[in-house]
Amino acid sequence: ATSAIQNGLGNQYPPGIGVPELRQAISDHQQRFYGLSYDPDSEILVTAGASEALAAAVLALCETGDEVVTFEPWYDIYGANIAMAGATKKVVTLRPPHYAFEESEFLAALSPKTRLILLNSPHNPTGKVFSRQELEFIAKVAVERDLLVVTDEVYEHLVFEGEHIPIASFPGMRERTIAI
């Protein structure tokens, strides 16, 4: 950092989409850990933090009258972002002790107004990591119903049991997923 500042690289705002080296590093990370290939120049955007990215995604994708499916408990910013977009939150409960959800409850939360699914795995605040089977189910429904998924994966490397699997890695999901 000191060298960058001394060489005049840290004296102004960065490019709006993020510095190229960081976008390339993010692309390399996704390829190395998950086999997902992203173009750093057209498919990666660096924000000031995950909360900003979540707000931008929900505000860009939702309009008044849309519905967003979330899993509760949830990170409190989700509700605020959905409300700011004029959308309605539809809740699917994660039940202890394993914080599993009922597929029937998930399906009941969907309607013709559903625009997107907001998924957080590893989950805050429970630490739950959605299983391959759960993600396959969500992905299948998203593809069948042409839904978008915004996935909050900020804790992807804080996994104590199981493994983190990005929903974007399932068939038909890469092009309908915004990963944070």
PLM features: residue spans?
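Short glycine-rich anion-binding loops that position phosphate/pyrophosphate groups of nucleotides
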Residues: A50-S51, Y75, S121-N124
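Active-site phosphate-binding strand-loop segment of PLP-dependent enzymes
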Residues: L94-E161, I165-A168
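Short beta->alpha connector loops at strand-helix junctions that form conserved
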Residues: E72, V91-R95
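Conserved PLP-anchoring active-site segment centered on the Schiff-base-forming lysine
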Residues: A60-I82
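N-terminal small-domain helix-loop-helix segment of the aminotransferase-like
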Residues: A1-G49, A56, E105
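Active-site PLP attachment segment
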Residues: F170-I180
